[in-house]
């Protein structure tokens, strides 16, 4: 029980601490930062690829990004659970 509470406190600290460390800071995406750095280094650079789908707003883009991450996590944890269940079944046999 003590170990669980300690781990939970560490997770909460990791979630909340960045907001206090970077108080008033801007949380921007890495795509925009990369684009500005490329333009600073090579102003004539033209992207060689365009997105297949451009979301209508930033909120929809965030939603799609979150769904993509959730789906990836679901697949990973399904595979881990399947392997664990298979291992338990083999141990019983």
From Swiss-Prot:
What one GO molecular function would you report for this record? cobalt ion transmembrane transporter activity
The listed locations are: Cell inner membrane
Keywords attached to this entry: Cell inner membrane, Cell membrane, Cobalamin biosynthesis, Cobalt, Cobalt transport, Ion transport, Membrane, Transmembrane, Transmembrane helix, Transport
Is DNA-binding a UniProt keyword of this protein?
Answer: no
Give one Pfam family: CbiN
TM ranges are 5-25, 63-83
Q: Which InterPro entries match?
A: CbiN (IPR003705)
Bilayer disposition of the protein:
Multi-pass membrane protein
Give the primary localization class. membrane
Record has Ribosomal protein as a keyword? no
Picking any one GO biological process from the record gives: cobalamin biosynthetic process
**One GO CC annotation, please?**
plasma membrane
Pathway, per UniProt? Cofactor biosynthesis; adenosylcobalamin biosynthesis
- PANTHER family to which the protein is assigned, alphabetical: COBALT TRANSPORT PROTEIN CBIN (PTHR38662:SF1)
* Biological function: Part of the energy-coupling factor (ECF) transporter complex CbiMNOQ involved in cobalt import.
Q: How does it assemble?
A: Forms an energy-coupling factor (ECF) transporter complex composed of an ATP-binding protein (A component, CbiO), a transmembrane protein (T component, CbiQ) and 2 possible substrate-capture proteins (S components, CbiM and CbiN) of unknown stoichimetry.
Which family, according to the similarity comment?
Belongs to the CbiN family.
The entry's protein name is Cobalt transport protein CbiN
Source lineage: Bacteria, Pseudomonadati, Pseudomonadota, Gammaproteobacteria, Enterobacterales
Recorded name of the encoding gene: cbiN
């Amino acid at each position: 029980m003590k170990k669980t509470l300690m781990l939970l406190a560490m997770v909460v600290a990791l979630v909340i601490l960045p907001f206090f460390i970077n108080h008033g800071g801007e949380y921007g995406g890495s795509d925009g930062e990369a684009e500005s750095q490329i333009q600073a280094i090579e102003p004539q650079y033209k992207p060689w690829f365009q997105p297949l789908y451009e979301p209508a707003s930033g909120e929809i883009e965030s939603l799609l990004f979150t769904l993509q991450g959730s789906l990836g996590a679901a697949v990973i944890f399904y595979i881990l659970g399947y392997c664990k269940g298979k291992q338990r079944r083999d141990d019983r046999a």
